[in-house]
Amino acid sequence: PLYSSAASDVYKRQSLGHQVEEIAHPIDHSITGRAMSRMINTYTYQSVGKRAKELNLPLDDCPIEASTLAMAKRGQTTSAIAYVDARNCLIEAEQQLQDFYQQYDVIIQPVLTKAPAKIGWLDMNSQDLREYGGRFTAYSGITALANGTGQPSMSVPMHVAEPNLPVGALFTAAWGGDAT
């Protein structure tokens, strides 16, 4: 219900001369999501591990959120081959999107998958990191895919829901298509 009015606002763009089609997203986000997580974990370890060494602290004693520590630990154990496989997965997604953008100018999708959460709903210090990860992934939608594949995107308010809540649509273009 939150996005139904925003979706109808997207279709109003047809009156401005745009062709609007409802299609399935061309990328399997579950596969690219795992690849992005592996890369993010590796970079998190690179940053946190470096700081831990500077402070002469074991990784477990770093004063950081539980979720950040878990990501750093996963990154610490990521092999070079696993990292390269993850990067190759994103390169393949980038290429698939380039093919997609031969036919379409932009993808328009919700910025978030649900209304803004109450403070604390996404607890970075949760002891249940599966729940944290599941909530994060379910809430953030496809936005990370645009970031991970280098697609230029902008969040545009498309509708106002009750109580005076702006609902955004994410307009995403081809890599290098910032002027689209």
What is each PLM-predicted segment?
Residues P1-A7, Y11:
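Single conserved hydrophobic/aromatic residue that forms the stacking wall/gate
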Residues S15-I27:
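Flexible, glycine/charged-enriched surface loops at secondary-structure junctions
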Residues S30-N41, D123-N125, A169-F171:
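Short low-complexity, flexible loop/linker segments enriched in glycine and/or proline
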Residues M39-Q98, P110, K114, S155-L165:
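Short helix-loop capping/hinge segments that flank enzyme active sites or metal/cofactor-binding pockets
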Residues D105-V106:
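Short, Asp-centered acidic motifs that coordinate Mg2+ and/or phosphate
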Residues A117-Y139:
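Short, surface-exposed loop/helix-turn segments at secondary-structure junctions
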Residues L145-G148:
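Conserved short alpha-helical elements in the N-terminal third of ANL/AMP-binding
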Residues L165-W175:
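Short, well-ordered beta-strand elements
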